[in-house]
């Protein structure tokens, strides 16, 4: 696969016109050249601090204070987590992972307040 456009590369995301060569999902080359595309090519994102175990409460709490939303034991998040069964929790986590993948996040680091169960 060839990806052409402006490539943002290196730690400083230096813009370089050219193409990226990908074979079998592996980056093979970054080539500087005149690109026939206005696309922007950049490295995938890494979310270094997630709580996908709380995904069931992701859209909840508009208009609440932080304390009303997350304070244990009766903040809205904690109530929603207690009320949800395992299947609902897993489905919500799967949706969060799918969203991250679809929006360019290649990996994430998960923090679990309640353990891994």
Regions found by a protein language model. Give the residues of each.
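Active-site loop-helix segments enriched in His/Asp/Glu that coordinate
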Residues: 83-117
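Histidine-centered catalytic micro-motifs
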Residues: 43-55
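N-terminal metal-binding scaffold of metallo-dependent hydrolase/deaminase domains
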Residues: 1-33
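Conserved, mostly hydrophobic/aromatic
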Residues: 38, 49, 104
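Active-site gating loops and adjacent loop-to-helix segments of metal-dependent hydrolytic enzymes
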Residues: 55-91
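Residue-level structural signal for beta-strand termini and adjacent loop
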Residues: 32-33, 46, 58
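Catalytic metal-binding/acid-base residues of hydrolase active sites
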Residues: 8, 51, 113
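Active-site metal-binding motif and surrounding structural segment of the metallo-beta-lactamase
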Residues: 31-42
């Amino acid at each position: 696969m060839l990806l052409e456009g402006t490539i943002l590369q290196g730690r400083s995301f230096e813009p370089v016109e050219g193409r990226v060569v990908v074979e079998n999902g592996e980056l093979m080359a970054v080539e500087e050249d005149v690109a026939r595309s206005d696309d922007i090519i950049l490295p995938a994102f890494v979310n270094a601090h997630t709580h996908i175990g709380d995904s069931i409460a992701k859209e909840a709490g508009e208009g609440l204070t932080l304390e009303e939303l997350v304070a244990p034991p009766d903040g809205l998040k904690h109530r929603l987590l207690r009320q949800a069964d395992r299947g609902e929790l897993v489905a919500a986590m799967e949706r969060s992972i799918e969203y991250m993948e679809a929006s360019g996040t290649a990996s994430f680091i998960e923090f679990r307040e309640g353990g891994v169960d």
